[in-house]
Amino acid sequence: MRKMMQREVTYTTAQLARMKMVDGEVTAEVLEPVTLIGNLSVEQAQREINKRSEFKENPAQVVGVEANTQLYELPLDVFLEHATVKERPATKEEVAEVQA
């Protein structure tokens, strides 16, 4: 039996629209939803959208957000194959030992 690694991930789906002038009237062109990492408010999602290069030329307005949390699972051997090893920060006890 393979060991599995699980992780809950929260993401926000932002619904976007782009405002256009058509025959002297302002209309909203609905764009494809964008997925952002984390549980974001409309204001936070708008800031993230404004940072993206594809919206620099033609800005888009966030008209709604929907947060979701899902549980993801990956075999441990696949995780180890793709993961990057990071050094953990020193604990207070380890720092005290070095200073003593």
Swiss-Prot record:
Q: Name one GO molecular function term.
A: DNA binding
One GO term (biological process):
viral DNA genome replication
Q: InterPro entries in the record, alphabetically?
A: Histone-like_p6
User: What residue ranges does this record give for the DNA-binding region?
Assistant: 1-19
- Which superkingdom? Viruses
Q: Which UniProt keywords apply?
A: DNA condensation, DNA replication, DNA-binding, Early protein, Repressor, Transcription, Transcription regulation, Viral DNA replication
Under the subunit heading, UniProt states: Homodimer. Homomultimer. Binds to double-stranded DNA giving rise to multimeric nucleoprotein complexes.
The name under which this protein is listed is: Double-stranded DNA-binding protein
User: Which lineage?
Assistant: Viruses, Duplodnaviria, Heunggongvirae, Uroviricota, Caudoviricetes
